[in-house]
């Protein structure tokens, strides 16, 4: 039994490393473009609006915390808001309109031209993330999608698409976290160097 569990640990780590390696070998331009769009938006007084479901909601909150607080360097606070945290808004919009509108409605209320919307979806199929990216684009926000699998409708809804090509939700989430840390690092460096 212990050997089976040890094998599981080793196999899981090997899968995670293999996917990180695959993404490392891919084109870095979408990640660089995402960071540049965020730097440009924040540099012009805009804000970053982040959203996703489940683990992706947690990632949205994590990035907002890193930018409002600090990632690795002391610098001025950066305007980042996770649209996943206000349970009263989420439940009222979900109940009165539809769950597919919980993020789009907040984009309509909070988003302004020059802001940046970052939608996260491991499946690439989340209707509420697609709806929010559509609302953001209509309002003149830059749009970024961070997806898994083939990117799906979420990837197609965004101007900038960062994809982690895997069917494993857990492995996609792990690489998403790494890529989001890279984006935080790039954004933070841009503001520290100013």
What does each of the following model-derived ranges do?
Residues 1-26:
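Generic N-terminal amphipathic, Lys/Arg-enriched alpha-helix
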């Amino acid at each position: 039994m212990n050997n089976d569990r040890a094998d599981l640990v080793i196999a899981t780590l090997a899968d995670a490393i293999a996917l990180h390696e695959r993404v490392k070998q891919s084109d870095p331009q979408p990640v660089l473009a995402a960071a540049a769009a965020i730097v440009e938006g924040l540099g012009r007084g805009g804000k970053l609006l982040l959203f996703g479901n489940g683990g992706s909601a947690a990632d949205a909150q994590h990035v907002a915390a890193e930018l409002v607080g600090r990632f690795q360097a002391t610098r001025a606070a950066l305007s980042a808001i996770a649209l996943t945290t206000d349970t009263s808004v989420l439940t009222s919009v979900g109940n009165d309109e539809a769950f597919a509108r919980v993020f789009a409605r907040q984009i309509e209320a909070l988003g302004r031209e020059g802001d940046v919307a970052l939608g996260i979806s491991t499946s690439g199929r989340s209707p509420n993330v697609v709806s929010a990216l559509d609302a953001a684009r209509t309002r003149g926000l830059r749009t970024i999608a961070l997806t898994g699998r083939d990117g799906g409708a979420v990837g197609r809804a965004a101007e900038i698409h960062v994809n982690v090509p895997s069917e494993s939700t857990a492995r996609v989430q792990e690489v998403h976290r790494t890529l989001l840390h890279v984006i935080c690092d790039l954004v933070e460096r841009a503001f520290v160097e100013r």
